[in-house]
């Protein structure tokens, strides 16, 4: 069986589908080859009577994520705000503390200085890193050879700050601090708008969700493309030795095109044979960028009882014994299907896969009962979870991470074409990489690279800025005068030391002038 078209897209996630739609809209014939029995990739919306619909994969959108908002609106989708009306909870050392705002408050003055310096330093270091080429940062190699654990050991003076910083890394990239490059993580946070934007619900990356689920983005593009989207077609071979590119699938089908877009996580490239072989750096890159580990858990209740206690459902939970590190309210906008969404992250995900689904649910409910101080948390009516570690056509979630030393050596080839193969996927984005926004940016950029290759657009139109969403405008992230100018703990100690020396000198001079020194 032979199928000819202009472009073959490997991977039917949001990035691949966005690429296919743009090319289709420009009049090119496209075939999408998807390994799974569904489109959506790392977005996955299920429907049943208990949940109506629920996103078990990528779900959240917010201000400055203008491409996914534009595409979704074009497809007829609407957003709703994640509930953050009531108070948030910070659970640490067995106690719950209510707060408002993106970060838990700190009352110890020394810890506060340390805490403030942590976020300020990460944002300042991020400003030194180019979003489109992090390997060009002035101190790229120094930062890349350092793990985030090593960087946090340098920045943080108090255990409290180090622990919340570790949770921040776990939550942002579903990996441990000793696993990721400092350069890569600082870049990752920077290209998401900084520490406050990436972690926030209101005015941040988790502000909104799509009514009906994020899986509809890919599903509605599939409806547009029709039978040009082929499911259960894992690609096993790409041959560029002839005039056209020949692609073979696991079920022995042959497809032929002028160009190919690879819209899969880099590591899944190892499942595909290439003729001729991939260039050396590309061949090694795909063996060196694993995906994070996460289990997404949705616990359903009769009603959102936490709201009656003036809690919004957001919980920041510290402690090795706690299976969940972070939660959000996942109740439907009409108040139905009351639920708490929680992430089991990084090493905890790898540890808790040994338990049964029922055992994980019990641990979650016991934790929520303790954090919320409510026995109602022990009475779930339904439970859904998705262990992304077991997905052979994802390899994990949310995104691929770069261990120390990899970004500066191999980063340049991440989206560098190989012959007639162009690369998409959220990992190749320069803005909100790791999110649906990054997936759309990458897919449309790869599509425009092909449009340029065939002479339809000039080179300077490959990368295009996106107008701000009218429906979801962004408010600027601002810091107070104190947040900008408070010293770090070492800075305070130096200041106190200098003050002590100056005071002692002044007192000595005064005593000398008054003749108070005794001469022997």
UniProtKB/Swiss-Prot annotation:
User: According to the UniProt topology, which residue ranges lie Cytoplasmic?
Assistant: 2-489
Needs which cofactor?
FAD
Q: Does the keyword Mitochondrion apply?
A: yes
Q: What is its main location?
A: mitochondrion
- List GO BP terms, alphabetically: negative regulation of serotonin secretion; phenylethylamine catabolic process; positive regulation of dopamine metabolic process; response to aluminum ion; response to corticosterone; response to ethanol; response to lipopolysaccharide; response to selenium ion
Any ranges marked Mitochondrial intermembrane in the topology annotation, and which? 517-520
Sorted alphabetically, which Pfam families does this protein's record hold? Amino_oxidase
Catalyzed reactions: a secondary aliphatic amine + O2 + H2O = a primary amine + an aldehyde + H2O2; (R)-adrenaline + O2 + H2O = (R)-3,4-dihydroxymandelaldehyde + methylamine + H2O2; a primary methyl amine + O2 + H2O = an aldehyde + H2O2 + NH4(+); dopamine + O2 + H2O = 3,4-dihydroxyphenylacetaldehyde + H2O2 + NH4(+)
Please give the residue positions where the record annotates the modification S-8alpha-FAD cysteine.
397
Which Enzyme Commission number(s) are on file for it? 1.4.3.21, 1.4.3.4
Q: Which Gene3D superfamilies match?
A: 3.90.660.10, 6.10.250.130, FAD/NAD(P)-binding domain (3.50.50.60), Guanine Nucleotide Dissociation Inhibitor, domain 1 (1.10.405.10)
Q: Record's Gene Ontology CC terms?
A: dendrite; mitochondrial outer membrane; mitochondrion; neuronal cell body
Transmembrane region positions? 490-516
- N6-acetyllysine carried by residues: 52
Q: How does it assemble?
A: Monomer, homo- or heterodimer (containing two subunits of similar size). Each subunit contains a covalently bound flavin. Enzymatically active as monomer.
Q: What is the recorded name of this protein? A: Amine oxidase [flavin-containing] B
> What species does this protein belong to?
Rattus norvegicus (Rat)
Query: What is the taxonomic lineage of the source species?
Result: Eukaryota, Metazoa, Chordata, Craniata, Vertebrata
User: What would be the name of the gene that encodes this protein?
Assistant: Maob
């Amino acid at each position: 069986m032979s199928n000819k078209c202009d472009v073959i897209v490997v991977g039917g996630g949001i990035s691949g589908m966005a690429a296919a739609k743009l090319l289709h809209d420009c009049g090119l014939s496209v075939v999408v080859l998807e390994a799974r029995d569904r489109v959506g990739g790392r977005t996955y919306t299920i429907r049943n009577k208990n949940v109506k619909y629920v996103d078990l994969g990528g779900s959240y959108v917010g201000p400055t994520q203008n491409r996914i908002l534009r595409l979704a609106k074009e497809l007829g989708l609407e957003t709703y705000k994640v509930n953050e009306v009531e108070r948030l909870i910070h659970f640490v050392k067995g106690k719950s503390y209510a707060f408002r705002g993106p970060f838990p408050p700190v009352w110890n003055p020394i810890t506060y200085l340390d805490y403030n310096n942590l976020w300020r330093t990460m944002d300042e270091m991020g400003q030194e890193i180019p979003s489109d080429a992090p390997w060009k940062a002035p101190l790229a190699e120094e930062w890349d050879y350092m793990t985030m654990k090593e960087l946090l050991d340098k920045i943080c003076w108090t255990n409290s700050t180090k622990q919340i910083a570790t949770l921040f890394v776990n939550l942002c990239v579903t990996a441990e601090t000793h696993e990721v490059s400092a350069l890569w993580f600082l870049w990752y946070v920077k290209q998401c708008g900084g520490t406050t934007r990436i972690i926030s619900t209101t005015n941040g990356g988790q502000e909104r969700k799509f009514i009906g689920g994020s899986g509809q983005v890919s599903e509605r593009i599939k409806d547009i493309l029709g039978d040009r989207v082929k499911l259960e077609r894992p690609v096993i071979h790409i041959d560029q030795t002839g005039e056209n590119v020949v692609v073979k699938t696991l079920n022995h089908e042959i497809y032929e095109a002028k160009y190919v877009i690879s819209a899969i996580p880099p590591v899944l490239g190892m499942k595909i044979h290439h003729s001729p072989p991939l260039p050396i750096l590309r061949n090694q890159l795909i063996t060196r960028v694993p995906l994070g580990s996460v289990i997404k858990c949705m616990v359903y209740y009769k009603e959102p009882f936490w709201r009656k206690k003036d809690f919004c459902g957001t919980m920041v939970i510290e402690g090795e014994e706690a299976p969940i590190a972070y939660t959000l309210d996942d109740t439907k906008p009409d108040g139905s299907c009351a639920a708490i969404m929680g992430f089991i992250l990084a090493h905890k995900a790898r540890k808790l896969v040994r338990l049964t689904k029922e055992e994980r649910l019990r641990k979650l409910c016991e934790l929520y009962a303790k954090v919320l101080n409510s026995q109602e948390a022990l009475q779930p009516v339904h439970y859904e979870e998705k262990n992304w570690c077991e997905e052979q056509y994802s390899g994990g979630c949310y995104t691929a991470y770069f261990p120390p030393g990899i970004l500066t050596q191999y980063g340049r080839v991440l989206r560098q074409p190989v012959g007639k193969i162009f690369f998409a996927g959220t990992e190749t984005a320069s803005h909100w990489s790791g999110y649906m926004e990054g997936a759309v940016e990458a897919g449309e950029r790869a599509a425009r690279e092909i449009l340029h290759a065939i002479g339809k657009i000039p080179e300077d139109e490959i990368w295009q800025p996106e107008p701000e969403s009218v429906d979801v405008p962004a408010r600027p992230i601002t810091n107070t005068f104190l947040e900008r100018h408070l010293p770090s703990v070492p800075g305070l100690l130096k200041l106190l030391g200098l003050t002590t020396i100056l005071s002692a000198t002044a007192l000595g001079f005064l005593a000398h002038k008054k003749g108070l020194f005794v001469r022997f």
